[in-house]
Structure formats: structure tokens, C-alpha cells
Amino acid sequence: HGRTLTACNDINLNVYKGKTLGIVGESGCGKSTFVRMVISLDKPTSGEILYHGKNLANLSKKETWLNRQNMQMVFQDPLASFDPKMKIVDILTEPLINFGKLRRSEKEAKARELLEMVELPGDFVDRYPHNMSGGQRQRISIARALSLEPEILVCDEATSALDVSVQESVIELLVRLQKEKNISMLFICHDLALIRSFAHQIAVMYLGNIVEVIPGEDVTEHAV
């Protein structure tokens, strides 16, 4: 029999409405496994992940799919998650069409609105991902993730592949959108200095455990 590898153990965290919880730790500490469980890609072998009081591990396939609207993800490498043959107009509106929230005739207008939200020109609708810079692609990722108006945005090393100046502008954008839309953010990162600059609370992970929770601003709201 193979031994069970415990990637995450004894983790007890709350994500608060409109606030950012940072998860920081070195590679291999369990951050990615934790994220996969939060967004229901993996199920925990024990314990619960509660969202509005419901245990996500107990949801049916259909309920899990519907719940994806409430939790959206921004990855480190947008190119890996985009279809290179799709224009930006289709990349941005695909989630809305999949969930039956947009007519095809409304695609371009909605895509332009989403581009404006992330401070990109409207004529980007006709571009392809490879015709854009890394920072621009990450803005497209953010716009796509927020198109469904989720309650929680999960950013997995979302700025680590970007230059420092671009990193700062993307974080400024996320902070602005969080305030405007009152979104909760779970921001996974290996750079403590970066995450301290904007997170309200930071959990430090080491070998699958939360070893320290560093408070940011006072967090008094109720957990979602």
C-alpha cells in the first residue's frame, strides 16, 4: 500500500466579504492543493469547506457547476487557459454564454464593457491573445473572471510572471475592482512583501500547515 501524502492539514481560515485573504508560502507548501479544494477541483479527504453554510464537498455535479459562477479564478499564465484561436470578444463572453446569461447578438457590446472595466481599449475585441502583452492578457483574465459577477475571486500566482511595474498596475486594478464590486479575494503568492501591500489578512503556509496568520487591516465583516 502506498502512503497517503498530506498536502494540506489542519487549515482553518475565513474569507471575508469584500476583503483579501493572502496565502503565502514557498513552492510545494500546499498552496495549489488548497486552491483546488476551494474551487471544488479536488475534494478534501476530511474536513469541510463551507460557502454560505453549505459544505462544497457535498454538492452535486450540477450544484458544483452552478457554484462556479460565485467563485472565479485568475491563473498565473493566461495563455495556458485561453484558446489561442479565439478572439478576445469570444474569450471574454464565453462564461456568460455558457451560463445562459448573454445572447450572442450582445457579445461585442458586453466585451467592450468588460474591456473598459479593466482599462483596455474597446478595439481589443478583435485581437487574439498572442497579439497582447503579458499584463494585457492578465487584464483579460480578470475581466473574464469578473464577467459572471462572482462573490469570490481566486488569484493563483496571478502576478508572479509579470514585470514589477506591470505587477503593481494589475494589483491596483484588482484593489479598485474589489472596492467597486465588494468582491472577496483569495490571493495565492510566494512574495510576502507584495501581498502585504494590499491584503487584509495573510496566512503563511509551510509543509501543508498554516503556521501564522498576519492581520492586515481590521477584518470585522462576516465570513462568506
What spans do the regions from the language model cover?
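ABC transporter nucleotide-binding domains
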Residues: 1-223
